[in-house]
Amino acid sequence: MIDVIEYTKLYGDTVAVQSLSFRVAPGDVLGLVGPNGAGKTTTLRALAGILQPTSGSIRIAGIDLHTDPVAAKSRLAFIPDEPQLFDYLTVTEHLQFVARLYGVHEAGPRIPVLLEELELTAKKDALPTELSRGMKQKLAIACGLLHQPSALLLDEPLTGLDPVGIRRMKVTIAARAREGAAVILSSHLLHLVEELCTRILVIRRGQAVALGTLAEIVESRPDLAGRSLEEMFIALTGDESAS
């Protein structure tokens, strides 16, 4: 469960995100979409505990991220769009390091299963410098999944993946939701959002302009009936660069 209540983030006098409230239940996949600069990454970084809110509260699995950050962060995984890896650790050593960090005692049998799921078994002894951009992304996601987080935050998770890798990643994301994780997926790929997400949150200039299933959004905005998600996105945000 992810609960966001009246989250606001200011940088000086500049409002990055204003009065944002939503909930992601276990098993839900929330698509976070908006134009560049809308506040998507700021929101994800706040949910990950990297940025402190100016006001409002965030709870991960019922735990307040501000008052008990260690416990809250232990229940989430944030995979940014640029993988953060260690140059001198192999693929397997990355996972072993994460296991120690999160106290995953049963990591031994879990690591090869994750490597197989994300098609990294053949690269288990490789260093990051020997990996393609897509393989680095897969490794970052494997590290995020190792401790079986209750909340999964994904920022452009398909970056650098080939078509086979994209298909595999979609299966992985859907599987984690079925297992009960609350998932937030931020992406400019609207077809991916429409395929994977149970609900959509559209933000513009740091504010929510739509939240719900496609049917619920259309119900609140009858003028959007019969339009594609791309057309709805443009109408809601005024952004002609959607793709």
How would you label these PLM feature ranges?
Residues L127-G134:
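Conserved ABC ATPase signature
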Residues V193-E195:
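A short, surface-exposed alpha-helical micro-motif characterized by mixed small hydrophobic
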Residues G56-T67, A71-A72:
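Conserved ABC transporter NBD signature motif
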Residues Q96, R100-K123:
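Conserved ABC ATPase "signature" region
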Residues L152-E156:
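Catalytic Walker B motif of ABC-type/P-loop ATPase nucleotide-binding domains
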Residues L211-G212:
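ABC ATPase "signature
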